C-alpha cells in the first residue's frame, strides 16, 4: 500500500525530529481493526494496544494503564470505539518515545456523537452508558483544525499532507539538561527561603528535585500527596531519599535542611504554610498542565503569601522535542492549557448562568470557565471535563469581566431519592451512585428521609486571584439562588479550614457535618454545609446543625480539636438518638457515624459494655480490644459492639427498642 510506504518515510522523519504524532482511524469496527493491524505490521515497534478487550498482543486495559507509567513505548493503539477514557489517553501519550505514532480508533465519524460511551459509567452517575455529544463535537473540532494530526476515515480518500522538515533533535543523555543544570546551581546556592518549580509533564522537575537532594550537603525530607508518585524523585535522590506523608510530618517534630514538596498544589494551602514555616529551605514542585493536575492558581495564591518566593519554570521537554505535535494535540483536546489563568480580568463583573448546550453554540465561554476552574483546583482532571460537558444535572454560573472570566461556579443536582431508598441509605444498606452530600446527610445524619429532599451541590467555585476579595464568590452563590427554583437547599463539601468556613458562612451556609478523621493528603477534616431554600431544607439544616452541636464534645474528644459550633452539654437520649442507636444496633450504620449518640448511651447505661466502652471511652485500639475480648478480627468486634448497643437499649426500654428494631428491619427488604 502506498499509504504505508509514505507513513514509513514520515516515521523516520519524526524520529530524527524527536516528535510524535496522532493518527485517527474512524470507521466500522472491522475496518478500524484491520487497518490498525496493517500499521502495526508495517512499522516496527512495541505497539502497546489499549482496549477494554484483549484484541491484540501487548494488550493493556485503560484502567490498568497507570501501572505502565514511567515506562516508554514505540507506537501504540488506543481503542475508543466504545468509550473514550480521556485520562488513559493522556497518560498513554506520555509513555510514547520520540518517533512514535498514537493510533486512535474511533466509531464511524457521522455516528460517533450519538453512540453511547461506556466510559460515561465512571463519571455520569447514570446506570447505563450515555451519548456524549458535546465532548465528541469538541474533539472533532480539535482533530479537524489540527494540521499535524492525520485523519483516516473509512470510505474517504486517504491523503498524507507534506510536513515541513524540523530541526534534528538530540535526545537526553541522563545528565542534567542545560536548563536543569542552570536551575540546579541556583537552588544549591539559594539563601534560606522558598522556591517553586513549575512545569508541564515530562520536563524533568521530579528528576531535578531528586538531583538537588543528592547534591546538598545537609539533609532533606520529601513529602507529597502520595508516596507512589515520588518514584522518579527517589531514583535520583538515591540514599538521601526520605519520605514522610504531609499529615504525619505536621504531627511530628522532624527537622531537615531542606523540605521538598512534590506536587505541592495538591496539598491545601493552610497545611502547606505550616509545613513550609518549619524548614529553613523549601522546594515546591507542581504541574501546571496535564492530567496530573494544574497548579497556576496555586502558584498565584502562594505568591501572595510569600512575596519573596523564588519562582522557576522548566520548559524544555526531556523525552521529545519542543513543540511535539502529539503533546500539543492532547493538550488542546483535553484543555490542559491554562494560560488564560495568567490574564487579569478587567472591568465590572456580570453574573450569568449557562447550561451545557453552550458547548454547541459558543464553546469559547465554557472552555474559559473550565480553564479557570482547573487552574484554581488542583484535582480537576479529564474526568471533570467530560462530566462538565455531558453528565446530566450539571449547572454553571460565570462572573464575566470585560475581557476574561473572573469567576465561575459549577453546581450538581442531588437528592430526590425515593423514601425507601433514602431509608436504606440511612441504615447503611445501600449506596447508590452519586449524590455525595445528599447521601451523606442520610448515611451520617439523623433523618432517614434526608436524601428525599432535592438539592444542588457546589462542585467547584473559583475566582481569579487578581479579582479576589471583591465579593465575587458571594455574588456567584447569590446568583445560584436567583437562578435555582423548586429546590430545598444548596450544599457544599470541603476540606475544613477557618478561612474557607468563614467564606461559606458569609454566603449563608449552615454547618451540618464534620468528618471524624483527617484526610491524609490534605490534613483537613471534611465539612459539609447547607444553604436552605425551602421550609423542608431549613428544618433539615436546623436539625443536623443541632445534632452537630450535641455531638461537638464527643467529636472534639475524638479528634482532639474543637468544632466551630456552640457545643450543647446534653446527655439525655433524644428521639433522634434512639433512632440512630437502633440503626447502629440493628442495621449497618458505622460506629463513628453514631459516635455522639453512643457516647450518650454509655453515659446513660449501667451495663459493662466492654467492647463499646473500651473503644469510645478508653480509646483502646481495635487490635487491643480483639485480644482482650478474644475476638478474631474487626468484623467480629463490630458485631459485638452492635450487640452491646442492642443490650443497652433493651435494658433501658424494651418495648421502644422492639418497635424500632421491627421498623428498621423492614428497610432491608428494599429492592
Residue ranges of each PLM-predicted region?
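Conserved lysine of the Walker
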Residues: 32-33, 205
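N-terminal accessory nucleic-acid engagement/regulatory domains that precede
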Residues: 65-162
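Terminal substrate-recognition subdomain of acyl/acetyltransferases
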Residues: 248-250, 258, 270-271, 277-378, ...
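Conserved beta-hairpin
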Residues: 393-412, 419
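Conserved coupling/interface region of RecA-like P-loop/ASCE motor cores
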Residues: 125-175, 303-342
Amino acid at each position: 500500500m502506498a499509504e504505508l510506504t509514505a507513513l514509513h518515510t514520515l516515521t523516520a522523519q519524526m524520529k530524527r525530529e524527536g516528535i510524535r504524532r496522532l493518527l485517527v482511524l474512524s470507521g466500522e469496527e472491522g475496518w478500524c481493526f484491520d487497518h490498525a493491524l496493517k500499521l502495526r505490521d508495517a512499522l516496527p515497534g512495541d505497539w502497546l494496544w489499549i482496549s477494554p478487550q484483549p484484541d491484540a498482543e501487548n494488550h493493556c486495559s485503560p484502567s490498568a494503564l497507570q501501572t505502565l507509567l514511567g515506562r516508554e513505548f514505540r507506537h501504540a493503539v488506543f481503542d475508543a470505539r466504545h468509550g473514550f477514557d480521556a485520562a488513559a489517553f493522556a497518560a498513554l501519550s506520555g509513555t510514547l518515545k520520540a518517533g512514535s505514532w498514537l493510533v486512535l480508533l474511533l466509531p464511524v465519524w457521522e455516528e460517533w456523537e450519538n453512540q453511547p460511551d461506556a466510559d460515561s459509567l465512571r463519571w455520569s452517575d447514570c446506570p447505563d452508558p450515555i451519548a456524549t455529544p458535546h465532548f465528541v463535537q469538541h474533539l472533532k473540532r480539535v482533530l479537524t483544525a489540527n494540521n499535524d494530526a492525520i485523519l483516516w476515515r473509512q470510505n474517504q480518500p486517504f491523503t498524507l499532507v507534506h510536513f515541513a522538515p524540523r530541526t534534528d533533535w538530540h535526545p537526553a543523555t541522563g545528565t542534567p539538561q542545560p536548563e536543569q543544570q542552570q536551575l540546579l546551581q541556583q537552588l544549591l546556592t539559594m539563601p534560606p527561603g522558598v522556591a517553586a518549580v513549575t512545569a508541564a509533564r515530562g520536563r524533568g522537575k521530579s528528576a531535578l528535585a531528586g538531583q538537588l537532594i543528592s547534591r546538598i550537603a545537609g539533609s532533606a525530607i520529601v513529602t507529597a500527596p502520595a508516596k507512589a508518585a515520588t518514584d522518579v524523585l527517589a531514583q535520583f535522590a538515591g540514599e538521601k531519599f526520605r519520605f514522610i506523608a504531609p499529615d504525619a510530618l505536621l504531627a511530628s517534630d522532624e527537622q531537615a535542611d531542606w523540605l521538598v514538596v512534590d506536587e505541592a498544589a495538591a496539598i491545601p494551602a493552610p497545611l502547606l504554610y505550616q509545613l513550609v514555616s518549619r524548614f529553613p529551605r523549601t522546594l515546591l514542585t507542581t504541574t501546571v498542565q496535564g492530567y496530573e493536575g494544574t497548579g497556576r492558581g496555586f502558584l498565584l495564591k502562594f505568591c501572595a503569601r510569600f512575596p519573596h518566593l523564588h519562582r522557576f519554570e522548566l520548559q524544555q521537554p526531556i523525552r521529545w522535542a519542543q513543540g511535539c505535535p502529539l503533546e500539543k494535540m492532547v493538550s488542546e483536546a483535553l484543555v490542559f492549557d491554562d494560560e488564560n489563568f495568567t490574564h487579569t480580568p478587567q472591568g465590572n463583573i456580570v453574573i450569568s448562568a449557562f447550561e451545557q448546550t453552550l458547548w454547541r453554540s459558543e464553546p469559547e465561554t465554557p472552555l474559559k470557565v473550565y480553564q479557570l476552574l482547573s487552574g484554581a483546583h488542583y484535582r480537576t482532571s479529564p474526568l471533570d471535563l467530560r462530566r462538565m460537558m455531558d453528565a446530566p444535572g450539571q449547572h454553571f454560573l460565570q462572573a464575566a469581566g470585560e475581557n476574561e472570566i473572573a469567576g465561575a461556579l459549577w453546581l450538581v443536582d442531588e437528592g430526590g431519592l425515593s423514601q425507601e431508598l433514602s431509608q436504606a441509605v440511612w441504615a447503611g444498606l445501600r449506596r447508590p451512585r452519586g449524590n455525595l452530600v445528599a447521601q451523606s446527610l442520610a448515611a451520617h445524619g439523623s433523618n432517614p428521609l434526608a436524601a428525599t429532599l432535592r438539592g444542588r451541590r457546589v462542585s467547584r467555585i473559583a475566582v481569579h486571584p487578581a479579582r479576589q476579595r471583591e465579593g465575587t464568590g458571594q455574588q456567584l452563590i447569590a446568583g445560584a439562588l436567583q437562578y435555582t427554583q423548586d429546590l430545598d437547599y444548596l450544599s457544599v463539601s470541603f476540606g475544613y479550614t477557618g478561612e474557607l468556613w468563614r467564606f461559606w458562612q458569609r454566603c449563608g451556609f449552615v454547618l451540618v457535618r464534620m468528618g471524624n478523621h483527617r484526610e491524609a493528603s490534605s490534613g483537613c477534616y471534611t465539612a459539609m454545609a447547607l444553604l436552605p431554600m425551602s421550609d423542608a431544607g431549613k428544618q433539615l439544616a436546623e436539625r443536623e446543625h443541632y445534632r452537630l452541636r450535641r455531638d461537638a464534645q464527643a467529636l472534639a474528644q475524638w479528634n482532639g480539636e474543637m468544632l466551630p459550633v456552640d457545643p450543647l452539654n446534653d446527655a439525655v437520649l433524644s428521639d433522634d438518638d434512639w433512632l440512630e442507636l437502633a440503626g447502629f444496633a440493628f442495621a449497618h450504620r458505622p460506629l463513628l457515624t453514631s459516635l455522639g449518640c453512643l457516647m450518650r448511651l454509655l453515659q446513660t447505661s449501667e451495663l459493662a459494655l466492654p467492647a463499646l466502652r473500651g473503644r469510645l471511652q478508653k480509646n483502646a485500639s481495635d487490635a487491643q480490644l480483639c485480644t482482650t475480648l478474644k475476638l478474631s478480627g474487626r468484623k467480629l468486634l463490630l458485631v459485638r459492639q452492635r450487640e452491646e448497643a442492642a443490650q443497652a437499649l433493651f435494658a433501658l426500654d424494651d418495648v421502644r427498642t422492639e418497635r424500632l428494631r421491627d421498623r428498621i428491619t423492614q428497610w432491608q427488604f428494599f429492592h
